[in-house]
Swiss-Prot record:
Keyword Signal part of the UniProt annotation: yes
Function: Associated with the protein storage vacuole formation.
Domain remark from Swiss-Prot or TrEMBL: The BURP domain located at the C-terminus has not been identified in non-plant proteins.
UniProt name for this protein: Unknown seed protein USP
Domain BURP: 68-259
Cited Pfam families: BURP
Organism: Vicia faba (Broad bean)
Length: 268
């Protein structure tokens, strides 16, 4: 199928979190994008202590990250069963050690085995830009500096809770080489923002088995030469460097891409 770029009329803005307390981070957001509510994905960055009482990504949500599939699977009518078909487990590292930095911020941490330092201070790949941020202002500054403009938009998923079976309703391409900001799975509120080259981001409209409609941020990697061959074969029965490989992005992350069609930022 032909993937169309998102237009202003086709943008679906997610429900935004209601923030009543004034914070410097939110004030800074409003100073750059007036009258644009802060997306729920970034609300943890306003917690005064910078620490949540539990891990932000629950075991049920891990399925959103662990299903790998082909780019040609992104078409209306395709069925996805999260955490079952083509799943490589709830905690995965699809790239080998030599390119570990490429995916440190994509795949979730096992708290008992990895630390924030493993994600934030590991070597980066060639042409990769990576920053860990613990404040909303820092994130805003990083993405604006990267794109050289405030005309950008943030896009995220809104997977329905306790739903694993979905049917694709529509697919929209939103951009290449997006900057991904992932909430790391620790109590301390830290987002890892990075750009991985040779990637394409999509918003996939899904319908759950109970009829609930949702949007899924999806990233396809076109350069898979560094992927772990055992995991890739287990999931898709292909070898690294042969075909693009895609995965969904869960609710605790967002993709920043240029906004060529609107004056104001719109968060999906």
């Amino acid at each position: 199928m032909e993937f169309a770029h998102l237009t202003v009329l086709s943008l679906f803005c997610l429900a935004f979190v209601g923030i009543t307390a004034t914070s410097s981070g939110e004030d800074y957001w409003q100073s750059i994008w007036p009258n644009t509510p802060l997306p729920k994905t970034f609300s943890d960055l306003l917690i005064p202590s910078g620490i949540t009482n539990s891990l932000p990504i629950k075991s049920e949500e891990l399925k959103q990250y662990s299903t790998l599939f082909f780019e040609h699977d992104l078409h209306p009518g395709k069925n996805f069963n999260l955490g079952h078909t083509n799943s490589v487990g709830s905690i995965i590292r699809p790239f080998t050690k030599s390119r570990q930095g490429v995916t440190d911020s994509i795949w979730l941490a096992n708290k008992e085995k990895q630390s924030l330092e493993d994600f934030c201070y590991s070597p980066t790949a060639i042409a990769e830009h990576k920053h860990c941020v613990s404040s909303l202002k820092s994130m805003i500054d990083q993405v604006i500096s990267h794109f050289g403009s405030t005309k950008i938009k943030a896009i995220s998923s809104n997977f329905a809770p306790y739903q694993d079976q979905y049917v694709v309703e529509d697919v929209k391409k939103v951009g290449d080489n997006a900057v991904m900001c992932h909430r790391l799975n620790f109590e301390k509120v830290v987002f890892n923002c990075h750009q991985v080259r040779d990637t394409t981001a999509y918003v996939v409209s899904l319908v759950a088995s109970d009829g609930t409609k949702t949007k899924a941020l999806t990233v396809c990697h076109h350069d898979t030469r560094g992927m772990n061959p055992e995991l890739l074969y287990e999931a898709l029965e292909v070898t690294p460097g042969t075909v693009p490989v895609c995965h969904f992005i869960g609710n605790k992350a967002a993709a920043w891409v240029p906004n060529h069609t609107a004056d104001n930022l719109c968060v999906m």
